[in-house]
Amino acid sequence: MKTKLLLLPIARLLLAIVVCLPVWSSNMFAQTTESYAVLDNAAGTLTFKHDANKPAGAFSMNEDKTFPAWYDGDGTEYNKNNITKVVFDPSFANARPTNCYAWFFACKDLTTIEGLEYLNTEKVTNMNSMFSNCLSLTSLDLSNFKTKM
């Protein structure tokens, strides 16, 4: 009889643990999201993302008046000759960059920018030289940019 009485509370406890487990595990292992860019040299594509899956070799966003990290390793030469296409992944809509200084400066072979609507510019304070000398870029829709004077 005592065994039967103990089974009911134990069963309730186990049920409560199973029901709460997804909540506990999602909070225990929450990952930090971050903004980054990935350069695929073979395809000539620079892709911007904002998530918790930054791969090795991905570039962080630049701060202040410094050139972006997708310059080459020593910071003196740009991967500009490799970039023909820029893609803003839908995840980048959650990013809030504060600086776009020289993001595409002198990318003379850049012809296409996809997903520009996912670039939220409301916190950006510096867009200096963002598209300077993009000689092959023939059109650009900036209607989604939110800027203040």
Task: Enumerate the predicted regions with their spans.
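Negatively charged
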Residues: 31-149
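Bacterial Sec-dependent N-terminal signal peptides
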Residues: 1-32
